[in-house]
Amino acid sequence: MARVKRSLNAKKKRRVVLSQAKGYRGQRSRLYRKAKEQMLHSMTYAYRDRKDRKGQFRRLWIQRINAASRAHGLTYNRFMQGLKAAGIEVDRRMLAELAVNDAAAFAALVETAKKAIPAPSESAA
């Protein structure tokens, strides 16, 4: 059997890795082994952070809703409790959007939530 020389395949593989590593500092963009290792780490971080981004946005939405509802005299927890009791199913993303861009609509939701919150029971004392 003839011997297979991997010249073209190896060069292509290295060229792809080095082109993906453009923009890295120092040896990580010029040397194949360092670039390959950095690419593996970069892809791991990218995968992890794509998952983490969803939680970061949820935290941001909750902060915005909390700030806006406190301006109307209600904490985030009580506001969400009131919305659930009133049967209003608006997700946090839309609530945060309303809080930032449409204060009148958000104020109406807060008033609805205030009316729907059950009175605290006296038997707990």
Curated annotation (Swiss-Prot):
Question: Carries keyword Ribosomal protein?
Answer: yes
Biological processes per GO annotation = ribosomal large subunit assembly; translation
State the coiled-coil residue ranges. Answer: none
Keyword Protein transport among record annotations: no
InterPro entries (alphabetical): Ribosomal_bL20, RIBOSOMAL_L20_CS, Ribosomal_protein_bL20_C
In terms of Pfam families, this protein maps to: Ribosomal_L20 (PF00453)
UniProt keyword terms in alphabetical order: Ribonucleoprotein, Ribosomal protein, RNA-binding, rRNA-binding
Q: Name one GO cellular component term.
A: ribosome
Q: Which GO terms describe its molecular function?
A: rRNA binding; structural constituent of ribosome
| Similarity comment: family membership | Belongs to the bacterial ribosomal protein bL20 family.
Q: Matching PANTHER family, A to Z?
A: 39S RIBOSOMAL PROTEIN L20
Function of the protein: Binds directly to 23S ribosomal RNA and is necessary for the in vitro assembly process of the 50S ribosomal subunit. It is not involved in the protein synthesizing functions of that subunit.
Kindly provide the name given to this protein in its UniProt entry.
Large ribosomal subunit protein bL20
